[in-house]
Amino acid sequence: MLKTIQKHGVTLAVFAALTTGLTAMVNALTKTTIEGQAALQQKQLFDQVLPPEMYDNDIQQSCYLVSAPALGRGEKQLWVARKGDTPVAVVMQATAPDGYSGAIQLLVGADFKGTVLGTRVTEHHETPGLGDKIETRISDWITGFAGQVIHGPNDTRWAVKKDGGQFDQFTGATITPRAVVNAVKRAGLYAQTLEPQLSTLPSCGENP
């Protein structure tokens, strides 16, 4: 009887060990797959705001942290694109705090000379059928920033047409596009100041 119990105990222990090992392996594989998918999605988003032919570094591994009012409250991430060893452009997280239904989160690509290379919305709560035209699945409005140059903070073209600028507003919704235009302009102006600061920026994940 005792031998039978001991035998069953050993069997259960082996089974438990195998199950634990298998679970750990599955979790590790799942984590790797999820991380890989997230990295792929991020790269696809970067390609929409920054032409891939502009740079040859692994931009996702060139991530830095900044606290800049021009990009919105709190700490933001930015990624530096390099050609050879020369910084040529940057992708920045930015926030338009004054959307109609709250903050609008953006990704803005820009060079260091005043040209916005692309913009995409990553999160918003704008009204369906009105403010949601900032999404590419609804409208191509957001693509109109690509190639636009900012000639300083007093460049009045960087406004919606209702305010005397060059960017269309939406029918029945001016607040949303105005907020995005202003946020992209601020981010583009900030990019013009960045190049001399790059060597001093903390890397993402770096301990303070």
Curated annotation (Swiss-Prot):
GO biological process: electron transport chain
Top enzyme category: translocase
Residues that span the membrane, as ranges: 9-29
Entry cofactors: FMN
InterPro entries, per database record: FMN-bd, Ion_transpt_RnfG/RsxG
Gene Ontology molecular function, alphabetical: electron transfer activity; FMN binding
Subcellular location: Cell inner membrane
SMART domains: FMN_bind
Keywords assigned by UniProt, alphabetized: Cell inner membrane, Cell membrane, Electron transport, Flavoprotein, FMN, Membrane, Phosphoprotein, Translocase, Transmembrane, Transmembrane helix, Transport
One Gene Ontology term, aspect cellular component: plasma membrane
Mode of membrane association: Single-pass membrane protein
Domain of life: Bacteria
Modified residues (FMN phosphoryl threonine): T174
Known function: Part of a membrane-bound complex that couples electron transfer with translocation of ions across the membrane.
Subunit relationships: The complex is composed of six subunits: RnfA, RnfB, RnfC, RnfD, RnfE and RnfG.
Identification of the protein by name: Ion-translocating oxidoreductase complex subunit G
Provenance organism: Cronobacter sakazakii (strain ATCC BAA-894)
Gene assigned in the entry: rnfG
